[in-house]
UniProtKB/Swiss-Prot annotation:
UniProt key word Transmembrane: no
Assigned protein family: Belongs to the neurotoxin 36 family. 02 subfamily.
Protein name (Swiss-Prot/TrEMBL): Hainantoxin-X.2
Disulfide bridge partners, by residue number: 39-56, 46-59, 55-64
Organism: Cyriopagopus hainanus (Chinese bird spider)
């Protein structure tokens, strides 16, 4: 009897975790924060690959182009 209960609990945990993982991936794809990318417009100063916000185009001679 106890083994059946343990198996049932294990199966329920597996189903719930799979369901939660599936919804988590959907939430990340739909999130506006993930889709929105900030970038520096042309003419703004830049410092290459070490800067936090990249250029919308290319960093050339310390200016975004």
């Amino acid at each position: 009897m106890n083994v059946k209960i343990l198996v049932l609990v294990a199966v329920l945990c597996l189903v719930v975790s799979t369901h939660a993982e599936r919804h988590s991936k959907t939430d990340m794809e739909d999130s506006p924060m993930i889709q929105e990318r900030k970038c520096l417009p042309p003419g703004k100063p830049c410092y290459g690959a070490t800067q936090k916000i990249p250029c919308c185009g290319v960093c050339s001679h310390n200016n975004c182009t």
